[in-house]
């Protein structure tokens, strides 16, 4: 298969908070170990919205015109001279963080902790709201024809849940509570189901998201506008508490609730990042009950497992994509995801449609 690569491409460039313009940029040149990818689908993530509205996340500050988007999949358009894993026309999912491979974290297999990672759409590295991106072949993964590009793009948020399951050693038959049903939380439900959790309890404010969680595999849903999460969890678990809790929303109250829901000797994973640096937690409860607490930062070694889970049909993510936009409509897509969270789940942009 051949693919004619143009010299220039369209890109959705953020010039200021809530201001995106469509520009023409050169198609990137690839190094010997890289592939050029024609981007077919990009999901909008919470971090994209944070940069879009605030221009920064913590120490990562947007200081120049910037391209968002990191949940992506596409088609190989060109390969470098030493690339031996791919050919033009291959359909691929993209793991968006390129690491050094030399530091202590990389050598230990925890490359998500690499201090020199170059992560798409994390300043100063531009993202995937463009028609073409380049990527080192190590971070590109073949997808079967049975997977759509949208599903392949969702492997990125799915990976966060897979990583949380691996870190907390989630066992078949376990009871788990997952707080927050944003896109990461919904994909965390999928991960819990794929790992064989027996009881999956989820909490959120929005009926749309709770119903989506049911479709993803949740066995119990709790609308915290109407119900007391802890009381409901006590009832469901016969006062035992859950084996594992994941907080995915970055909400301080939800984190405290997640901790309180865990049984003696249980586990808590902090998946969502709160806006504040310090949150009060019940330290005597943690110590007296020997609660293990896990930080979750992105993921490592998850993409093959994510592709396997989706291709097997264990979980079905097709219903999560509620809104679709062209590259020229990227600002509209961002505003939709920002302002109508009660109406949409995952908003997808198609740079080459």
Curated annotation (Swiss-Prot):
Annotated residues for binding of substrate: 51, 156, 298-299
Q: Which residues bind Zn(2+)?
A: 45, 70-71
PROSITE patterns registered for this protein in UniProt: ADH_ZINC
- UniProt cross-references to Pfam families, sorted A to Z: ADH_N, ADH_zinc_N
Recorded GO MF terms: D-xylulose reductase activity; L-iditol 2-dehydrogenase (NAD+) activity; zinc ion binding
Give EC number(s), comma-separated. 1.1.1.-, 1.1.1.14, 1.1.1.9
Q: What Gene3D superfamilies does the annotation carry? A: Medium-chain alcohol dehydrogenases, catalytic domain, NAD(P)-binding Rossmann-like Domain
This entry's comment on the bound cofactor is: Binds 1 Zn(2+) ion per subunit.
In terms of superkingdom, the source organism counts as: Bacteria
Give residues annotated as binding NAD(+).
184, 204, 209, 271-273, 296-298
Q: Does the keyword Metal-binding apply?
A: yes
Q: Which cofactor does it need?
A: Zn(2+)
Q: Which reaction does it catalyse?
A: keto-D-fructose + NADH + H(+) = D-sorbitol + NAD(+); xylitol + NAD(+) = D-xylulose + NADH + H(+); L-iditol + NAD(+) = keto-L-sorbose + NADH + H(+)
**InterPro entries of this UniProt entry?**
ADH-like_C, ADH-like_N, ADH_Zn_CS, GroES-like_sf, NAD(P)-bd_dom_sf, PKS_ER, SDH-like
> What family does the database annotate?
Belongs to the zinc-containing alcohol dehydrogenase family.
Under the subunit heading, UniProt states: Homotetramer.
- Give the protein's function: Polyol dehydrogenase that catalyzes the NAD(+)-dependent oxidation of various sugar alcohols. Is mostly active with D-sorbitol (D-glucitol), xylitol and L-iditol as substrates, leading to the C2-oxidized products D-fructose, D-xylulose and L-sorbose, respectively.
Q: What is this protein called?
A: Sorbitol dehydrogenase
Q: Which organism is it from?
A: Bacillus subtilis (strain 168)
- Name of the gene this protein is made from: gutB
